[in-house]
Regions:
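Cyclophilin-like peptidyl-prolyl cis-trans isomerases
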Residues: 16-192
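Bacterial N-terminal signal peptides
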Residues: 2-16
């Protein structure tokens, strides 16, 4: 068979295959006492992490929670690897759902760019109801980065689409070490 015919037949065969559609990003809004943050969650690349986050959203467990931690370049004197994030959590007194498996950036292909949403964790497979938002590029939070000694990084799962100025306003709140003195209330987190 001639090479041109083979290419033509291959092109026809590919067109005949059913289209593979990735899930569309899921839009959410995080309403805080300092303003709103809009974001898109990437369930196509981080399905386990997005499902976990949405479980808390749909159960309204982030409503009444807060941003309690602000990490800046100046308030981590004992850390050789510096990062910049704000960290939020579910409302006090709400039970955590079971922890989830870590979806490392080496698997998802997502990276910790400015405005990335990611899950906080201690060890691998321990993430539950705390998340953070990055300020600036944070490659040390990716797989192979050195912020967590295990080198597994953190599970990035979304990105801020509007409201980075609110993220920076939260980061600028007065802190005692890295704890925000008057935590910023999460009024509501909802799908848009």
């Amino acid at each position: 068979m001639k090479p041109g015919i083979v290419v033509w037949l291959a092109a026809i065969a590919i067109r005949a295959l059913p289209a593979q559609h990735s899930p569309r990003p899921i839009a959410i809004v995080i309403e805080t006492s300092l303003g709103s943050i809009e974001a898109e969650l990437d369930s196509a690349h981080a399905p386990v992490t997005v499902a976990n986050f949405l479980r808390y959203v749909d159960a309204k467990r982030f409503d009444g929670g807060n941003f309690f931690r602000s990490v800046t370049l100046s308030n981590q004197p004992n850390d050789s690897v510096k990062i910049e994030v704000i960290q939020g959590r579910a409302a006090a007194g709400t039970a955590a759902f079971p922890s989830i498996a870590l979806e490392p950036t080496s698997v998802t292909g997502l990276r910790h760019h400015d405005g990335t949403l990611s899950m906080a964790r201690a060890g691998p497979n321990t993430a539950t109801n705390q998340f953070f938002i990055t300020i600036g590029e944070q490659p040390q939070l990716d797989f192979g980065g050195h912020r967590n000694p295990d080198g597994q990084g953190f599970a990035a799962f979304g990105r801020v689409t509007s409201g980075l100025e609110v993220v920076r306003r939260i980061q600028a709140q007065p802190v005692n070490a890295q704890t925000i003195v008057a935590p910023v209330t999460i009024l509501r987190v909802a799908r848009r």
